[in-house]
Amino acid sequence: MAEEKRSAEEKKMQKDIVVSYRNEKEGKGCRGLLVAFFSELLHPAVSGNKSAEFRALGAKKSMPDLAYIHDGKIYGIELKMPDSNHDRNHIIEQADVMATYFFRGYFVWSKEILWNILDAIERGQPIMSNTLQVKDYCLRNSTTKVSFEKIIRELF
């Protein structure tokens, strides 16, 4: 039950961010493009027997929630609620995907933090990726679940 609530909260945060981006930044000096991935469609609990179909259409496991495309570079953005708990291995997979396929990747827990990242990218001074820090934290912890609140407190 808490899993479903957290997922709904993360979806609400994503929706709020995308709508705010369109209203506040898109076409108003911001030259980048914010797009979404829907990796959750690959989970049978979400899409039932259609997960194989979504995979065949190009959906990839562990992709970040959003991507920001700017000046030919793609930045991965994975949204996490500050008070959420996640499977340690899944966070590691998400960090690996962002480190492998994206120019830079970011775990983000608020709209304000994302705006700071996007503003820095727009200025040509992108903030260092935090994916490897988060991955290293997860690798140092032997628990199966990690608290994102604890990650924020200890790393940032």
Q: Model-found features: residue ranges?
A:
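Catalytic phosphate/metal-binding cores of nucleic-acid and nucleotide-processing enzymes, i.e., regions
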Residues: 1-156
